[in-house]
Swiss-Prot record:
Substrates-to-products reaction catalysed: an L-alpha-amino acid + O2 + H2O = a 2-oxocarboxylate + H2O2 + NH4(+); L-leucine + O2 + H2O = 4-methyl-2-oxopentanoate + H2O2 + NH4(+); L-phenylalanine + O2 + H2O = 3-phenylpyruvate + H2O2 + NH4(+); L-histidine + O2 + H2O = 3-(imidazol-5-yl)pyruvate + H2O2 + NH4(+)
Gene Ontology MF: a single term: toxin activity
Family statement: Belongs to the flavin monoamine oxidase family. FIG1 subfamily.
Organism: Bothrops mattogrossensis (Pitviper)
GO CC field: extracellular region
Cofactor(s) this protein requires: FAD
Protein name: L-amino-acid oxidase
Reported tissue expression: Expressed by the venom gland.
Lineage: Eukaryota, Metazoa, Chordata, Craniata, Vertebrata
Function (record text): Catalyzes an oxidative deamination of predominantly hydrophobic and aromatic L-amino acids, thus producing hydrogen peroxide that may contribute to the diverse toxic effects of this enzyme. Is moderately active on L-Leu, L-His, and L-Phe, and very weakly active on L-Thr, and L-Cys. Exhibits diverse biological activities, such as hemorrhage, hemolysis, edema, antibacterial and antiparasitic activities, as well as regulation of platelet aggregation. Its effect on platelets is controversial, since it either induces aggregation or inhibits agonist-induced aggregation.
Main location: secreted
Assigned keywords, A-Z: Antibiotic, Antimicrobial, Apoptosis, Cytolysis, FAD, Flavoprotein, Hemolysis, Hemostasis impairing toxin, Oxidoreductase, Secreted, Toxin
Subunit structure, as described in the record: Homodimer; non-covalently linked.
GO biological process: apoptotic process; defense response to bacterium; killing of cells of another organism
Length: 31
């Protein structure tokens, strides 16, 4: 499974978006 939604700059460094409740696994590479 790949997680590649557009990432808001202020949250791009987080593994979890509090606002959206979206979780990313530790091995997910953020742009």
């Amino acid at each position: 499974i790949k997680f590649e939604p557009p990432l808001p700059p202020k949250k791009a460094h987080k593994k979890f978006w509090e606002d959206d409740g979206i979780y990313y696994p530790p091995n997910h590479n953020f742009p």
